[in-house]
Amino acid sequence: MKNGKVFLRLSVIALLLACTSGTIVQAEDVSGKVNEVSESAEDTVYGGNAVDGSALNNQLSITKEASVNGSAYSGYSSNREASGNTLKITRTGTIYESAEGGYVNSGSGAVSGNKVFMESGEVVQSINSGSTGGSGDATGNS
């Protein structure tokens, strides 16, 4: 009978592990993030970075003569929507790639209502208040 109890316990443990071992990934929006970059960054910087969701109402500020050796995105979505994001560039050094208010990398997500404010500094590639690498519309950005 002792072996039966051990087998039952092991069966219950195996069942629990099987039910919880898989990772369920759901689309998750990134909203309301505020990020200030005041020291130079070696890579791309983000206000909100949504891997599989929308980037909504995020803010990125680059201040105190900080340089960025990549791009600066206030709202970045890999495949959904990027709306209402704000990029502020004040007293900065150089952004060596692009400065983007809102950006959707692929898919049909809308890019709207994003803003870029630039007081001083240099952007080597491009400045876009809102753009997309996908098929969605980019409208109402400034």
Region spans (language model):
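Surface-exposed loop/turn motifs in large extracellular/passenger domains
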Residues: 27-44, 49-71, 77-98, 104-126, ...
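Gram-negative bacterial Sec-dependent N-terminal signal peptides
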Residues: 1-27
